[in-house]
Amino acid sequence: QSFMSYSIFSVITLIVAGYLIDKFTSRKLLIYMNIPLFLGTLVIIYFDAPQTAFLFLGLVGISNGLANLLGSSTWAEIYGVKYIGSIKALTTALMVFATAFGTALFGFFIDAGFSIEKIAFIAAIAIACSIALLFTIRKKLNPVYL
């Protein structure tokens, strides 16, 4: 049932994000993409009621909705559309690798006896670092057009 909140928030975000991209550009929205995911990890860390799964998955749905649209439009804004196929192929390959690596890493943490709260804390640190990095380089995300 909690996956319904993921689906609902993901679809709503897809609809709203399309409008926001047209209004503000992908490059400006990119830095905010992982903030809901970061908040979701905080939900896991600080709350343990079963109902928090709805909130967590809703926040993940928001980040995923943003990622689905920003994944293509940002590259097109920065590099143009001439090489978008090659760029998407590379980023998809990296995503598949990261998914496999992340699964193995989380499995390692679980086997090592880490609680879900500790794993979420480690993830929150990594996400916070990525958000901070994006805020740091946001003015350098200018079009390159090869």
Which ranges hold each PLM region?
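Residue-level signature of mid-helix packing/kink "hotspots" within the transmembrane helices
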Residues: 7-15, 96-100
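Helix-to-loop junctions at the C-terminal end of transmembrane segments
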Residues: 13-25, 110-111
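Structural signature of the two symmetry-related core transmembrane helices
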Residues: 28-42
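Helix-loop junctions at membrane interfaces in 12-TM secondary transporters
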Residues: 46-56
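Intracellular juxtamembrane helix-capping segments at the cytosolic ends
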Residues: 66-79
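Multi-pass alpha-helical transporter architecture, strongest
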Residues: 71, 121-146
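A late C-terminal transmembrane helix in Major Facilitator Superfamily
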Residues: 81-113
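A membrane-interface helix-boundary motif in multi-pass transporters
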Residues: 108-126
